[in-house]
Swiss-Prot record:
NCBIfam families: accA, AccA_sub, PRK05724.1
Gene name linked to the record: accA
Pfam families: ACCA
Alphabetic keyword roster: ATP-binding, Cytoplasm, Fatty acid biosynthesis, Fatty acid metabolism, Lipid biosynthesis, Lipid metabolism, Nucleotide-binding, Transferase
Record-given protein name: Acetyl-coenzyme A carboxylase carboxyl transferase subunit alpha
Superkingdom of this protein's organism: Bacteria
GO molecular function terms attached to this record: acetyl-CoA carboxylase activity; ATP binding; carboxyl- or carbamoyltransferase activity
Organism: Azoarcus sp. (strain BH72)
Assigned EC number: 2.1.3.15
Gene Ontology biological process: fatty acid biosynthetic process; malonyl-CoA biosynthetic process
InterPro entries: Acetyl_CoA_COase_a_su, ClpP/crotonase-like_dom_sf, COA_CT_C
PROSITE patterns: COA_CT_CTER
Pathway: Lipid metabolism; malonyl-CoA biosynthesis; malonyl-CoA from acetyl-CoA: step 1/1
Amino acid sequence: MKTTFLDFEQPIAELEEKIEQLRFVQDDSAVDISEEIARLEVKSQALTKDLYAKLTPWQIAQVARHPQRPYTLDYVQHIFTDFEELHGDRAYADDKAIVGGLARFNGQSCVIIGHQKGRDTKEKIARNFGMPRPEGYRKAMRLMKLAEKFGLPVFTFVDTPGAYPGIGAEERGQSEAIGHNLYVMAELKVPLICTVIGEGGSGGALAIAVGDQVMMMQYSTYSVISPEGCASILWKSAEKASEAAETMGITAARLKSLGLVDKVVNEPVGGAHRDHRAAAQSLKRALAEALRQVDTLSPSELVEQRMEKLMGYGRFKEIAA
C-alpha cells in the first residue's frame, strides 16, 4: 500500500516520489542507478527520523489519526493467536465500533477488547468511525466479567475520537454505560493491561482504559477533548487547534511525565503506519513485560493496587511560599 503523507511530511513525500521515479527508470534502463536510489533512501530515512524527533503535539495528533495506522484487529493479527471474536451485549445489539473476544498471548489464554475504526467508507460507517454506542461499552463489560469468571487477563486497545453523542445513544444510557464500565474495571479481579494505540478521546476512551498497567504508543494521544473541540470552546475557532494541543498536554511523553500512564511504547521511525509488524512487535514486548509485573498478584492485591493508583491521580503537594 502506498504511504499517505501528512501535510508536515511533504519534504519526505517529495523525496519518496523521487525515489519511486528512479526505481521506475531503473526497471526500464540499462543504466545502473541503484547507488543513487540507496543514497536517497538513506537520506529519506534520516529526514524522517529528524522530523519525527521534533513533532509538535498537534502534529502528533495528526499521526495518531493517520488513516493507515494499525487498528486493534491489526495488532490482534500480529500479536495474538487463536482469536475468536465474541459479539453483542446480550441486552440490545452488537456494536462494531468495539471488537473483543478470546485469544492466546504467548500461549496464555486471555480476553481482548478494543475500539475498531474502518479503512474504507463502507467499513467506517459500519464501525461508526470508531465511536462506540452504549451497547459497545456493555459488550466490553460483558467480556470483562467473562474474563473474571475464568481468571483470564484482559488486554484493551484504545483508539477512538470519543463515545458516540447521538440521540439514540443518549436515550440508551451512554453516560451510564461508561460509568458502569469504570466501576467494573476498578474492581475487576484479573490483570488489566490497557494501551492507547491511536486517539484516546475523553470518556469514550477511558471506558476501556482503567488498568493495572496503562501504556501509550509513542505517537498516540489521550485527552478530555479533541484539540479542535477545545479550541472551539476557548477561542471560538477550530483554527487554534495546534495551540490547544500544546496547552492540553495530550502526548504520550507529556502524560508519562505527569504519571498518568506507566509506559510509552516506541514506534518505528515515521510512525506505526509505516511498519505495522515492527510496531506490533514493539507492543508485544511491552505487553509481555506489563503482564509479567501483575500476573503473580492475587485478586485482592490487584484490586488494592489498582485503587491506590486511581486514587493517586491528581495528587499534589503544597509548598509554603
